[in-house]
């Protein structure tokens, strides 16, 4: 796949299980993007790497640089605790956007968890139109913890 002059095949897509030595760097990277404490990411990643949970962490590397990533957790800070697990912390570096990286990461997470018998997946977002391109459907509104307005909750079946 070639987009914006750079081949997507030039990037490496992987689970954190494939490169567990990236745990600290990945936690720091997600913290920089979302402001959630490193410790929260480290706890979730450690649970994944130790086999406590099948909910994974997925990265895109350009060489050794993390340029995209996302995680899967029980609940992404909203009131619909019955809708789990949730994709969280989806992010692609600005200089790598519009190449299909986030879509590939989303597909990787869906395929990985489906192979483990985990389906459907959910996510909360204010973006309209982006996730639909990758098979996600609007499911219902959800109230984010501490948020004044409801947000959109999507499902991938």
Model-derived segments and spans:
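Conserved N-terminal entry element of GNAT/NAT acetyltransferase domains
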Residues: 1-24, 157
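Active-site rim helix/loop that mediates acceptor-substrate recognition in acyltransferases
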Residues: 34-61, 67
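Short hydrophobic/aromatic beta-strand or adjacent loop that forms the aromatic wall/cage
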Residues: 55, 148-154
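Conserved acetyl-CoA-binding loop-helix of GNAT-fold acetyltransferases
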Residues: 92, 98-111
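Conserved beta-strand in the GNAT
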Residues: 59, 65-75, 86, 91
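Conserved active-site alpha-helix within GNAT-family acetyltransferase domains
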Residues: 115-119, 125-150
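Helix-loop element at the rim of GNAT/NAT acetyltransferase active sites that forms part
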Residues: 20, 27-40
